[in-house]
Amino acid sequence: MNMNATLLGQAIAFFFFVTFCMKYVWPPLMEAIEERQAKIADGLVAADRAAKDLNLAQANASEQLKEAKHAASELIEQANKRRAQIVDEAKAEAQAEREKILAQGLAEIESERNRARDELRKQVATLAVIGAEKILERSIDKDVHAELLNKVTAEL
């Protein structure tokens, strides 16, 4: 193999080409590749962080949902207790009102009965006086006396 000037010129040109590429072309390419690698790594880290944040958010959401359900069930339970209390109070008030009305009715009946008795006593007394006057006006005769008593009792 003969080494001639062309081969030597090509070797020198290749050496300058490699040196030029190593000094001016290679660093920007490596920098672009490294930037790309850094972006990819940052993206992977961000994706991992986002996945963790998503899991945390889902856990928080499920916890808040449980708390909301618990609070809602407590509210429903309190509402049911209050409803039962209101119903019981209404029943007690209705019972008290019923007893009050019944007592008033019984008192009114008793008052009316006493008034009727007093009126009847007055009438009986009046009739007895009238009967006694009639008996005294007439002669004392058993038949007339019995007849007058029958009339008085009939009037009673």
UniProtKB/Swiss-Prot annotation:
Purpose of the protein: F(1)F(0) ATP synthase produces ATP from ADP in the presence of a proton or sodium gradient. F-type ATPases consist of two structural domains, F(1) containing the extramembraneous catalytic core and F(0) containing the membrane proton channel, linked together by a central stalk and a peripheral stalk. During catalysis, ATP synthesis in the catalytic domain of F(1) is coupled via a rotary mechanism of the central stalk subunits to proton translocation. Component of the F(0) channel, it forms part of the peripheral stalk, linking F(1) to F(0).
Organism from which the protein derives: Photobacterium profundum (strain SS9)
Subunit-structure text: F-type ATPases have 2 components, F(1) - the catalytic core - and F(0) - the membrane proton channel. F(1) has five subunits: alpha(3), beta(3), gamma(1), delta(1), epsilon(1). F(0) has three main subunits: a(1), b(2) and c(10-14). The alpha and beta chains form an alternating ring which encloses part of the gamma chain. F(1) is attached to F(0) by a central stalk formed by the gamma and epsilon chains, while a peripheral stalk is formed by the delta and b chains.
Keywords recorded for this protein, A-Z: ATP synthesis, Cell inner membrane, Cell membrane, CF(0), Hydrogen ion transport, Ion transport, Membrane, Transmembrane, Transmembrane helix, Transport
Single annotated GO MF: proton-transporting ATPase activity, rotational mechanism
An annotated GO cellular component: plasma membrane
Protein location: Cell inner membrane
Assigned protein family: Belongs to the ATPase B chain family.
Segments traversing the membrane: 7-29
The protein's name in its UniProt record: ATP synthase subunit b
Keyword Signal belongs to the record: no
Topological relation to the membrane, as annotated: Single-pass membrane protein
Domain of life according to the entry: Bacteria
Pfam family, one: ATP-synt_B
Gene3D superfamilies documented for this protein: F1F0 ATP synthase subunit B, membrane domain (1.20.5.620)
